[in-house]
């Protein structure tokens, strides 16, 4: 966000997606690939809502960028390996299940889309 490398820069609390979109980054899911007790900067992992009902709620921010942006770290500081400094990275990011029926999802004018289920 700091270098305006994201389309979401400066859009906190703004509507950026459909009302039915809630996106979560959760580093606390037991046994999941991106889960750890702490990030690579020592911050505890949390379940973080990034987008709620289409509104941008939070960024994924490491400690250095949090300081530069005058925000708090979100526990997203991860290293690619010991050779690299921590940077903002996802843990387990997913779109939360919606409440609409299958029929309601496709009742509009959408010509293309992706439907996923467990």
Regions found by a protein language model. Name each.
Residues 1-118:
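N-terminal small-residue-enriched
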């Amino acid at each position: 966000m700091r270098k305006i490398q994201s389309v979401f820069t400066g859009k906190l609390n703004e509507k950026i997606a459909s009302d039915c979109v809630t996106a979560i980054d959760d580093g606390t899911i037991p046994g999941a690939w991106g889960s750890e007790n702490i990030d690579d900067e020592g911050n505890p992992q949390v379940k973080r809502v990034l987008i709620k009902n289409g509104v941008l709620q939070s960024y994924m921010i490491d400690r250095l960028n949090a300081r530069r942006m005058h925000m708090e770290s979100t526990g997203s500081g991860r290293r690619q390996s010991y050779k690299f400094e921590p940077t903002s990275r996802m843990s387990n990011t997913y779109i939360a299940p919606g409440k609409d029926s299958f029929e309601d999802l496709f009742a509009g004018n959408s010509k293309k889309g992706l439907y996923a289920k467990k």
